[in-house]
Amino acid sequence: MKKHLITGLFAALALTANAQSFKEWLDPEINAVNRAPMHTNYFAYESADAAMQGKKAQSTNYMTLNGTWKFSWVRNADQRPTDFWKVGFNDRGWNNLQVPAVWELNGYGDPIYVNTGYAWRNQFQNNPPEVPTENNHVGSYRREIIVPADWKGKDIIAHFGSVTSNMYLWVNGRYVGYSEDSKLEAEFDLTPYLKPGQTNLIAFQVFRWCDGTYLEDQDFFRYSGVGRDCYLYARNKKRIQDIRITPDLDEAYKNGSLRVTLDLKGSGNVNLELLDAAGKAVATETAKGSGTILMNVENPHKWTAETPYLYTLRATLQGSNEVIPIKVGFRKIELKGDQILVNGQAVLFKGADRHEIDPDGGYVVSPERMIQDIQVMKKFNINAVRTCHYPDDNLWYDLCDQYGLYVVAEANIESHGMGYREKTLAKRTDYAKAHMERNQRNVQRGFNHPSIIFWSLGNEAGFGPNFEACYRWIKNEDSSRAVQYEQAHGNEFTDIDCPMYADYKHMEKYGQRTDAKKPLIQCEYAHAMGNSQGGFKEYWDLIRKYPNLQGGFIWDFVDQSVRWKGKDEIGRAHV
């Protein structure tokens, strides 16, 4: 974890160097300006009782930004308003749009489904990092809010859960920063810009396409806008800035340990309590400042997809009222010989690939829909899910922890439309930083989830030095999990041989190998979109026959349909 002084210095330098240049959206080496460093998925509550209830929307430290915003949409990027962020700007002629919402399902542009090419393929020849100006829709948002007066003296952070494809942010007429990577949250420290207890103007602008779009060529509907919850939250000046947990089991898979790594803003001692599902303390420790401490637990309940038992780690900085709860699952992931083991047992991964998509909301997926997806998976004996092809909403991982699903957590990288060989972005130095940052932020955010057992470097993006560097970084950062990437083709930069659509002959040949050093788990197979997915039994006859064949992930979990009240090619309205 980085020291905050260094992080703040770099952020200040970046802001000075790049402030409001409006060239960021075409520069692959500028993926953020003044964006806060990524941290693990947690929320700091105002009391132990609030922390145990775990309902952050009811916390006094939370303020939603969801709801109605003033909105302006233009078809071409060069038509975008350039002064809308000013406090005195007249937006009375603008429409209203909900946040979160995608534009194309709300009357602004059309939904486009593309598999292997970019959405501009009929009008523009690929030329990274350049993207078209024509048909590069831009949405501009404005909203006035009143920040709670009792937040004065605290740090106030803005959280934008998912914005496609990028965002520029202003507060009270002042430029705050910029962010790319549409499937991970962008957080900004708004403390210098906001006035607690008074009316404040929030304004941001979103482009349909930017240089980062070259890394977001996934096989699904292409939408734009805000896809996840947006909110403000307040933190004490002196606080736990980040907390990482690494559960482990001894060689007999009986007794457990929990390594807790703390990064404090300021100094102080941290009380750590590990509670079982009934709320009984099973281990306590006091950590002295930033650093790592080990908590030992005798014969804990073990976490698996079949037995998803969760403990709660409660972390409290002494002298502060902030309490951070973290769910803990004791489990051990190992690569032994040519098998992956969970708690000493070989697992057959009966997996599915799942896009985060909804027929009504597009990229906006409700908690109810997520729970429905998981319940369907459990009913059909699916025990694993791959997040295709990007990080999902934080809630999805919480639910996988709770219900019991093994997760392959994939970074937001697919450059399929560039091809896999010499033109691949995996070999381009100007996209090296973007590859690395997207993988780093994926790991930094999801580190604490027991359901995540594999990290995935991305999907269908060729292979080259950029992925080699990402693999090395992850293995150094997190030795407790396996790392996979299909385009590594079984070389030393993937712990799993994870091909796509390998046939029976390929599977049997691998199963018969005596020199295999890793398992074969297909990251995609048994293509199931529409009327398909034949020959499934034959795959599983082979998987059950050979121990180094450990399953696969069906492409994909559910058809990507849309209920769109648009018009067909001759102008007839339809749904």
Regions from the PLM with identified roles:
Residues K195-G197, D263-E334:
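Extended acidic/polar, glycine-enriched regions
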Residues Q20-A119, L201-W209, A277, W540, ...:
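Accessory carbohydrate-binding/adhesion or oligomerization-edge regions at the termini
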Residues F10-N18:
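Hydrophobic h-region of N-terminal signal peptides that target proteins for export
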Residues R244, R314-M377:
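N-terminal carbohydrate-binding accessory modules
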Residues I374-M377, A384-G571:
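Substrate-binding/catalytic cleft of secreted carbohydrate-active enzymes
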Residues E24, K55-K56, K70-V74, N106, ...:
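Accessory beta-strand-rich segments of carbohydrate-active enzymes
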Residues K237-G266:
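Surface beta-strand/loop "capping" patches
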Residues V176-G177, V282, V347:
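Short hydrophobic beta-strand segments in globular cytosolic domains
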